Amino acid sequence: MKYSEIKNSTNIFNKVGSDGNGTDEKYFEYLRSLCSVHPVETSRHKRYQDNDFECSPYVLWNNSLRLFNDDCDIYAIVYTSKDNESFKRVGIYIEQVFKYVEIRVNFIEKIIDYIDNYQ
């Protein structure tokens, strides 16, 4: 697989966002900002946001209670600046996250091979 194919892929998360230009990489960055890196500041990801301000103070496992009647593994509970809306849920599928990471880790081998062949 070529780097451009990895960079422009939408095959894992299938989330192109409101402008239609989203990619797996951009969606992963949005999830990462919500769930771990910048949970209070997600304004870089307008294509995936419903409002100007979003923050996710916590995530919940979608356990046996199936609180919201879908099959995702984890929910990012997202507070927004939208009037009359207490929160939104962003469903996260662990298998998709692992697949995304696996593809990028496997690409490291290609980089190493390229460097070895260059020398």
Question: What is each of the regions a protein language model found here?
Answer:
Residues T10-Q119:
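Acidic, Ser/Thr/Gly/Pro-rich intrinsically disordered interaction regions
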